[in-house]
Each structure stands twice: as C-alpha cells, then as structure tokens.
C-alpha cells in the first residue's frame, strides 16, 4: 500500500490543518507524522491527531508536541492507525510520554505489543457485577471510606498535605500485598514533582511494579489531553490480558479537562459554561467508563482532583464527582496536628460504606467512630472557651476516646521510613476493626493517648503503653 501524504495548510498554535488529495482523508483519531526541526533532528518526530474533517480534502489536527518551526506546505504522513503505546511488563519501571516513547534515557521499551489509546469501554456483559471492598492496609481508609474494587476514588488536598506520599504508599501496598501493578499518569502537573516521584519510588523499591506516563505542565495541550488515555491503555492490558487488579493514579484529573478546554476553542467549538468545552461531560465519560472491573480483572483508580478557587460547583470538578465511588479528603488541620495520613475522617465518603457490602460489624463500628469524632468536634468550641473542666463526665469520656481514635487513625508508612525512622505498617482489615471496636467500647480508657500515635494494630499500642509506663 502506498503511503498517504498530505500538506500543512495552516498552523494555529497547537492546532494544525492538513490538506490531502480528494478521497484520501485519514479517519478521525488517526495519527499523522510531521518533521519538526525545532524538537530534534529526527525525521517525522511530531505526532498530530486528526480531530475534525473540514470539507472534502482537509483535516484539522491536534499536535502532541511543540509546533514552533512548522511551515505551510510541509509534508504530513498518515500512519494509518491511531496513536498507540507499548503495553506489557516491559513498561514497568519506565517513564513514557503521551505517544509511548521513553523519556527516562534508559533505551527503547521493546514491548511485544502496542495498544491504541482510544478504546471501547467494556461491554455490559464483560463487566463484573460484584461489589467488593479493596483493602489498602491504611486504617483510616479501610475503616471509614473504603475503596471499591474497580471503583474511582477522588483524592482532594491542598499543597503539602501528603497526596504524593499517600499515592506512593498505595502503590507500595498493592505491589507487596496483592502482587499487583500500578500505572501512574502525570497529567499537567509539575515536572519537578514527576521527577521526585520517580526518585522516591526508586528509593522505596516499588518502581519495578509501576509504569509512569507523563505529560506535564510544560507540554502542549494536545499531550495533556491525551496522556491519561495512554496510561489507561497500559492499565487495560494488565487487566484484560493478564487478569490483574491494577491501580491507576491520575494526577491531576482537572488538568485533563483544562487541556481539553485549551484546544476546544482552537477547534472552532463554541465554549460552554465558564468557558469550558461543550464536550466536557462526553470526554470525561469516555475516560471514566473505561476504568472498571471486568470478569477478568479490575482497574481501581485514584484521581487527585484540583478544585479551582475551592469552588466545588465549577463544571470541571463537578463533572468528575459524578463518576466517583469514594472520596479521600486530606486536611491541613489534621496535618498540623502531626497526624499522618492527614485524611479527614468526617469529610471522606464512600459509596460502599454499607452493611450489605462491608458487613454489619464493620459498618456499626465505622458509624460509632464517626459519631465520637463528630461529638468531639461539636465540643471543641466549649473546650476552647471554658476548658475541659466544665464538661460533664460523659463528655470528658467522649473527648478522651475521640483523641485516642484520632491518634489511632495515624500510621507509619513504608515509603516514609527514611524520614520517620519507624517501620511502615500494613494493617489487615480485621485488626483495624478490632482496634477501633475496643477503643469505642472503652476497653482502653486507662491507656494514655500518645500510646495510640503512629502504630499499626491495637496490640502495638498496648506494647507502646507498657514502654511509656516503664
């Protein structure tokens, strides 16, 4: 088959129009290649993705890299297929970009197989109907806002409250306890953080269980709007071909929408509410519907969500919320108390905190813990004004238990061992339930609250109490 060439007819920022001979238009989502000497000296080094057909012989495309240095009349080669990325075990421990090229200077990936980045979501028949909890080994998550296998979790938090450390601990726990793989999509975030994550994962020994796909802030919007799809294709391979339970991290899902809105106007679409693209819900749905459990395996995704100007009604976060099964909210107030992970136990929610999914016992204890913490929160104003002495005996007991619960919700992480000096703990769900049940029931009212800080199970807290008393 002869190669199909077109010519660049106009360049507007990240959007490029290419003219082809009549009857030779490449289909939507096809990848075209152009030589851009401003990137490097390789031939056909710039990938364009067909987005629209304009009339009979012209297509409008989105560039996946810089368009500086392109000129009209340049040749564009139709590759005959969509953007595809290498998949399989060879991608583990590597950093790829949106078009599947390695950017870690460790040579080619040499994967046996490639997947296109636009794929159909699993059909109804293939989807798993079982709702089950996904144990993370992190007490506060497993007890109060459990993750569903194949579910989508929103991770909310400002700068410096521990989002990245929590993500790394989850990668570590799924690798060591479940033997599973993780895929990390860095979408429009800081390159420095992407670099730090790679270094830290290397140090903590989890890098060989994860594939990293980056399209960071400095990339053109085309790359940022597609990099989450590239990562998702890698995760889908592990789910569909290897039957794995994969963790997919997207940091940050807001940037995916933001990139879409940047190219939307250039593509000639009329903007919708707050200037976002009119196709916002469709684009989000196409991405999110591919993240699910099938009869073969599952993809559970944790998505960091930036909320612009703290406005939860902004169309971008509001569209993402519709897809979430659980939320993990990190709070600065809790981080200031030195309690890590700084998850807010009253603000975090989960769809599967339901006795029919997690069982009566777990549900009852989770609700009791929330009740005690909420009561303590309500009493804090009184304590601040009048002091502890003015409380009734019953309220004093609630406060004492709440403070123990608060401290027992902290735990040392494996990936932070180098900083904390205490070995990380993976806590089994039954131990988590047992520990909180005993605190709520008042079995440990005589033990000082500092014994509960930064331990794994309740037995460790009792050991620590003995050491403190000695």
UniProtKB/Swiss-Prot annotation:
GO terms for cellular component: plasma membrane; proton-transporting ATP synthase complex. It comes from Geobacter metallireducens (strain ATCC 53774 / DSM 7210 / GS-15). Pfam families: ATP-synt_ab, ATP-synt_ab_N, ATP-synt_VA_C. GO terms for molecular function: ATP binding; ATP hydrolysis activity; proton-transporting ATP synthase activity, rotational mechanism. Its EC number is 7.1.2.2. Produces ATP from ADP in the presence of a proton gradient across the membrane. The catalytic sites are hosted primarily by the beta subunits. The gene is atpD. Coiled coil: none annotated. Belongs to the ATPase alpha/beta chains family. It is found in: Cell inner membrane. The keyword Transmembrane helix does not apply. It catalyses: ATP + H2O + 4 H(+)(in) = ADP + phosphate + 5 H(+)(out). This is ATP synthase subunit beta. InterPro entries: AAA+_ATPase (IPR003593), ATP-synt_VA_C (IPR055190), ATP_synth_F1_bsu (IPR005722), ATPase_a/bsu_AS (IPR020003), ATPase_alpha/beta_chains (IPR050053), ATPase_F1/V1/A1_a/bsu_N (IPR004100), ATPase_F1/V1/A1_a/bsu_N_sf (IPR036121), ATPase_F1/V1/A1_a/bsu_nucl-bd (IPR000194). Keywords: ATP synthesis, ATP-binding, Cell inner membrane, Cell membrane, CF(1), Hydrogen ion transport, Ion transport, Membrane, Nucleotide-binding, Translocase, Transport. F-type ATPases have 2 components, CF(1) - the catalytic core - and CF(0) - the membrane proton channel. CF(1) has five subunits: alpha(3), beta(3), gamma(1), delta(1), epsilon(1). CF(0) has three main subunits: a(1), b(2) and c(9-12). The alpha and beta chains form an alternating ring which encloses part of the gamma chain. CF(1) is attached to CF(0) by a central stalk formed by the gamma and epsilon chains, while a peripheral stalk is formed by the delta and b chains. SMART domains: AAA (SM00382). It is a peripheral membrane protein. ATP binds at residues 157-164. Gene3D superfamilies: 2.40.10.170, Bovine Mitochondrial F1-atpase, Atp Synthase Beta Chain, Chain D, domain 3, P-loop containing nucleotide triphosphate hydrolases. It comes from the Bacteria.
